[in-house]
């Protein structure tokens, strides 16, 4: 069954963080933990990354030459040595907890010691414009499949299978949900509000997308129109194609929003159109950085390959970012969350990072 690692006691924030500030829209904080076993090649690798909204701000990698939590955003660098020391110790303890969990999970599923397995967890909270909690998250996955998750009421668990029910019974007996709820309703919100205040110049910004439409002949009879949105923040954006004013959702190829490597995002949407009918199609772009939605058409005279080169370079940067992060969403299905930044949140509670009190261990 699962065993509980000792919960790390976190310093509470000062009363100066009383609910006085307000922010535009909702905001989120997420921590993603990933542990990957590698039989015959040493201890499992443990990686943690933290996000506020769509911005990664901290990272820890047990494979680093000197494993330590590192800043990934300028506004977090102002935290003092105690912050980094405390979080580093939390992550090292969590790495050990996850090692035990991986061993037990292998037993739950009757798996051999030869294969590599992945344990992922995500936790965090969403706050509204008034800085109050909208929703908390605490979820786990094993080998890319849901394992157990804290329900929206923050009082009960949902187990994905019979193995996870072992964990569920253990946590219910230990009243683990109460501890998670206390963190999510308290410290998680307080730390998120602190980060929003310290990083407001970056986190509250709204960089509008740079947009254009490109034309790619397929044959004598068809061509692809691709609508590009580049360099925008935050990540939430809407791209739609219309033909004579009617939405072409079913016929649109839409890629997921992807990081550009410079703390902004990219996205495109494409439709295949009959040659000669390109001007009947319009691309519509909505983003909070735009004073009003944009409507674009392909302009034959302005066709250029330069933006495409920029995209290719950006995607190359993206590949490096993704490989380096090995974040929790590698094999976990993303769960939808209310608020910016998506979700798949875990019980590590310190952001300082809270150490997950749970190890999936017997």
Curated annotation (Swiss-Prot):
Residues 25-309 are extracellular. Residues 25-114 are annotated as: Alpha-1. The chain crosses the membrane at residues 310-333. Its main location: membrane. Residues 115-206 are annotated as: Alpha-2. Changing residue 95 to T: In allele B*08:01, allele B*13:02, allele B*14:01, allele B*15:01, allele B*18:01, allele B*35:01, allele B*37:01, allele B*38:01, allele B*39:02, allele B*40:01, allele B*40:02, allele B*41:01, allele B*44:02, allele B*45:01, allele B*47:01, allele B*48:01, allele B*49:01, allele B*50:01, allele B*51:01, allele B*52:01, allele B*53:01, allele B*59:01 and allele B*78:01. Residues 1-24 form the signal peptide. Residues 299-309 are annotated as: Connecting peptide. Changing residue 33 to D: In allele B*08:01; associated with increased risk for rheumatoid arthritis. Changing residue 292 to E: In allele B*73:01. The keyword Ribosomal protein does not apply. Changing residue 89 to R: In allele B*57:01 and allele B*58:01. Residues 334-362 are cytoplasmic. Changing residue 105 to A: In allele B*13:02, allele B*27:01, allele B*38:01, allele B*44:02, allele B*49:01, allele B*51:01, allele B*52:01, allele B*53:01, allele B*57:01, allele B*58:01 and allele B*59:01; requires 2 nucleotide substitutions. Antigen-presenting major histocompatibility complex class I (MHCI) molecule. In complex with B2M/beta 2 microglobulin displays primarily viral and tumor-derived peptides on antigen-presenting cells for recognition by alpha-beta T cell receptor (TCR) on HLA-B-restricted CD8-positive T cells, guiding antigen-specific T cell immune response to eliminate infected or transformed cells. May also present self-peptides derived from the signal sequence of secreted or membrane proteins, although T cells specific for these peptides are usually inactivated to prevent autoreactivity. Heterotrimer that consists of an alpha chain HLA-B, a beta chain B2M and a peptide (peptide-HLA-B-B2M). Early in biogenesis, HLA-B-B2M dimer interacts with the components of the peptide-loading complex composed of TAPBP, TAP1-TAP2, TAPBPL, PDIA3/ERP57 and CALR. Interacts with TAP1-TAP2 transporter via TAPBP; this interaction is obligatory for the loading of peptide epitopes delivered to the ER by TAP1-TAP2 transporter. This is HLA class I histocompatibility antigen, B alpha chain. It comes from Homo sapiens (Human). The gene is HLA-B.
């Amino acid at each position: 069954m699962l065993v509980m690692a000792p919960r790390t006691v976190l310093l509470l924030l000062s009363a100066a963080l009383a609910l006085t500030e307000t922010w535009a829209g909702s905001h989120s904080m997420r921590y993603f933990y990933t542990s990957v076993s590698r039989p015959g090649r040493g201890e499992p690798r443990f990686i943690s990354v933290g996000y506020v909204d769509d911005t990664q701000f901290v990272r820890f990698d047990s494979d680093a030459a000197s494993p330590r939590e590192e800043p990934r955003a300028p506004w977090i660098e102002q935290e003092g040595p105690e912050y980094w020391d405390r979080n580093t110790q939390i992550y090292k303890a969590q790495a050990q907890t996850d090692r035990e969990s991986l061993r037990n999970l292998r037993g739950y599923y009757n798996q051999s010691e030869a294969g590599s397995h992945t344990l992922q967890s995500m936790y965090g909270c969403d706050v509204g414009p008034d800085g109050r909690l909208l929703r908390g998250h605490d979820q786990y996955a094993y080998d890319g499949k849901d394992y157990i998750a804290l329900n929206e009421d923050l009082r009960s668990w949902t187990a994905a299978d019979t193995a996870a029910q072992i964990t569920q019974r253990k946590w219910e007996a230990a009243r683990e949900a109460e501890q998670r709820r206390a963190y999510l309703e308290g410290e998680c919100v307080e730390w998120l509000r602190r980060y929003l205040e310290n990083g407001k110049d970056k986190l509250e910004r709204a960089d509008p997308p740079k947009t254009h439409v490109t034309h790619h002949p397929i044959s004598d009879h068809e061509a692809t129109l691709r609508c590009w949105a580049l360099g925008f923040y935050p990540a939430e954006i809407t791209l739609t194609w219309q033909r004579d004013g009617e939405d072409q959702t079913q016929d649109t190829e839409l890629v997921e929003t992807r990081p550009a490597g410079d703390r902004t995002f990219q996205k495109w949407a494409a439709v295949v159109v009959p040659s000669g009918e390109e001007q009947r199609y319009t691309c519509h772009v909505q983003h909070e950085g735009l004073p009003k939605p944009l409507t674009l058409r392909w302009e034959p005279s302005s066709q250029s390959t330069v933006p495409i080169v920029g995209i290719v370079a950006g995607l190359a940067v993206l590949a490096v970012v993704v490989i380096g992060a090995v974040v929790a969403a590698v094999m976990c299905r993303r769960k939808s969350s209310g608020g910016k930044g998506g979700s798949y949140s875990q019980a590590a509670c310190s952001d300082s990072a809270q150490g997950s009190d749970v190890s999936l261990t017997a």
